[in-house]
Swiss-Prot record:
Its EC number is 4.1.1.39. Keywords: Calvin cycle, Carbon dioxide fixation, Chloroplast, Lyase, Magnesium, Metal-binding, Monooxygenase, Oxidoreductase, Photorespiration, Photosynthesis, Plastid. This is Ribulose bisphosphate carboxylase large chain. It catalyses: 2 (2R)-3-phosphoglycerate + 2 H(+) = D-ribulose 1,5-bisphosphate + CO2 + H2O; D-ribulose 1,5-bisphosphate + O2 = 2-phosphoglycolate + (2R)-3-phosphoglycerate + 2 H(+). Belongs to the RuBisCO large chain family. Type I subfamily. It comes from Trieres chinensis (Marine centric diatom). The basic functional RuBisCO is composed of a large chain homodimer in a 'head-to-tail' conformation. In form I RuBisCO this homodimer is arranged in a barrel-like tetramer with the small subunits forming a tetrameric 'cap' on each end of the 'barrel'.
Amino acid sequence: MSQSVSERTRIKSDRYESGVIPYAKMGYWDASYTVQDTDVLALFRITPQPGVDPVEAAAAVAGESSTATWTVVWTDLLTACERYRAKAYRVDPVPNTTDQYFAFIAYECDLFEEGSLANLTASIIGNVFGFKAVAALRLEDMRIPYAYLKTFQGPATGIVVERERLNKYGAPLLGATVKPKLGLSGKNYGRVVYEGLKGGLDFLKDDENINSQPFMRWRERFLYCLEGINRASAATGEVKGSYLNITAATMEEVYKRADYAKQIGSVIVIIDLVMGYTAIQSAAIWARDNDMLLHLHRAGNSTYARQKNHGINFRVICKWMRMSGVDHIHAGTVVGKLEGDPLMIKGFYDVLRLTTLDVNLPYGIFFDMSWASLRKCMPVASGGIHCGQMHQLIHYLGDDVVLQFGGGTIGHPDGIQAGATANRVALEAMVLARNEGADYFNPQVGPQILREAAKKCGPLQTALDLWKDISFNYTSTDTADFAETPTANV
């Protein structure tokens, strides 16, 4: 016997509630949820629109970054909805604010394709940042579970193997970015590489926007750089290198340049963050297959990482890039010309260098996390640093870092080689003093160590006279929520 329309409607209503329902009532908020070891966890800084309850805003973010749309859909009945819904399980007010909240959200691991950063980010940051229920939204931190991490390759080389290849231990590595970064001919570019390496640097590097322009095509640059590397290595007896930028318009062209770099003897190439997550992972797989180091310039990151209330915190980018498989990434200097709160920078470096992360709120680390045996990623400090800051750089950044003095090498009045020598002597003098127990970070002691070293090194004395104690101390935009730091109160 056929059922009446009213009877069918009654049965449907018993099984399924249609229409627009608050996200919190649809299962995207669960204060009693027990976090599972296999969950992907995300911490968002939420600024709800006026009149929007913080819990509802958190649930909305959870819903829109997982399975929800604006209305209930009957096809929910065809899925394991309870399992696949992301669950906001905790909302805390952000210290020292009146309209911001930390929302903790758990995602079932099966929501994400294995080993695909593009798929992970398509959910976590794909749609929710334009959602009307929130006035601003920032992804502050993530916990990637062991099971999901193991589907990513991580850095192919890592810090330990890179040091073995260079035969350099117990101190930062030294580098410089060729300046001016645009306009040099290939021959002059190669000369800069040679002079810097011969003067004592371990690396020179292409900058983010030197690719293949009319004034210097990529093949010309690669050949002259390798000539400079080989001559400097022969003259010094040290392993040297220069990061060759293979960033291009298509992956076909990226691979073409990468293959050529390998063929002529390069050991390291560089790509830019603006290439995109799929391109970065593809380049990392190529680097692993070809036994090459992969350096990542974070070009473009501050368009979404710098503002405190909206975007993506750079510590999350650090996690994603370590998962993707880059060996180096620019991660801040504290004392240079670019954004860099000391506690935030230390948090970035911990994310890249530690095997296990513990909750450290002053550093902005909200989750315990094991790196599941993925290799460590070498942080790079670059942008407005010079040898007179060596005591500060070593104190803040430690040993496992590449210190890149671009202008601080090439801007030396006596030439590029002299600038490189000044940096090398300053580094070795400071490391030696530290190892002997000196209070090198003391503002009276550190500069004096450099002055003593300069008595036997003319290039260092010239550099100290030129740049003195210049630093770029501005109030940081992105500061710790749970501690005050010096640059936040300049």
